A protein has these predicted regions:
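Glycine-rich phosphate-binding loops of nucleotide-dependent enzymes
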Residues: 1-160
């Protein structure tokens, strides 16, 4: 019952009702399917899921429980290549739904370029650049993700 985790469906008096297991299983399967994930067992323990499956489960839960904004802070860190692609595909599917804003925080230029429609680049808490993906070329993104002008300053300093 990973999907409901603290928000279980209960029928009967508050605190004394019965969990609606079949209904929770149905909803879990349905909601995961909406973002393209087919699960064999909605009761699979979280500990047996891959990192990508865990991230996808968290995203599906947020959508089901009414999130208007998903803030994804390095959602692919500590994942293998296959799991990274699984999570990125899920993010793209959510993006196509069109009713949820996604804030992706990443240090991975490739992932940013695959997902972003607009960028804001920070360095030490300061905005060093921003723009739409249609306005920024690959070199702009690379330069800003590596620290913008500050990286040039560092290069000069290291040459001294």
């Amino acid at each position: 019952r990973n999907f409901f985790l603290g928000r279980e469906l209960i029928k009967g008096p508050s605190g004394f009702g019965l969990m609606q297991m079949d209904e929770m299983d149905r909803i879990t399967t349905e909601e995961m399917s909406k973002i393209g994930i087919n699960i064999a067992n909605p009761n699979q323990p979280v500990g047996t899921m891959s990192g990508g499956q865990r991230q996808t489960l968290a995203i599906a839960r947020a959508i089901y429980f009414g999130a208007k904004i998903l803030i994804l802070d390095e959602p692919t860190s500590a994942l293998g290549q296959k799991q990274q692609m699984e999570v990125l595909k899920t993010i793209k599917k959510v993006q196509r739904l069109g009713n949820i804003a996604i804030i992706l925080i990443t240090h991975n230029e490739i992932h940013a370029r695959l997902i972003a429609d607009r960028y804001t680049f920070l360095s030490l808490g300061e905005v060093i650049g921003s723009g739409l993906s249609s306005e920024l070329g690959g070199e702009d993104v690379k330069r800003l993700m590596s620290g913008g002008a500050k990286i040039g300053d560092l290069a000069q300093e290291l040459e001294l």
